[in-house]
Amino acid sequence: MTGVQYSLSGLVAVPLPPAEALLLFTPRGEERWVRGWRPRFPMPSDDDCAPGTVFETDTHGERTTWIVVDRQEGRRVCYARVTPGSRAGTVTVTVTDDTRGGSTAEVVYDLTALSPQGARELRGFADGYADHLRSWQVAIAEHLSAPEAMTPG
């Protein structure tokens, strides 16, 4: 047993209405602003956030399998994720109106280490979580300010 589990939560400001902001946190939506994010779908799907949708990513030398567990259209999406032999858990993004024409996305990672190496990876992720979310906010803002950027959808 590794005995390492974290529940990490933080906020990301998005200068879009909630329904549009949530699209940036879908598998294909993240491709627009996350460098190196290339989800692969074993079964083609027009709706990449339909519950039961499975996709894989390869980042930082690791393959992770993701499954859309639940979604509340235009408001929330929840993914289960497993990096074999390393970490497993859920990621939930809930978007609310910030009353200024934009949105606030609450990003919650509930992760458990599956190995000693996974425990080290997870501790490092937890230590840098606030900076990680700040980098997301910057990347989203840069994406949305680019001349060729279109709102998601």
What are these regions (language model features)?
Residues 5-13, 54, 63, 76, ...:
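Intrinsic-disorder/low-complexity, polar/charged segments enriched in Ser/Thr/Lys/Arg/Asp/Glu/Gln
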Residues 15-19, 69-74, 94-104:
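A short, structured loop/turn motif at beta-sheet edges
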Residues 20-22, 33, 67, 89, ...:
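Short acidic, gly/pro-rich beta-turn/loop elements at beta-sheet edges
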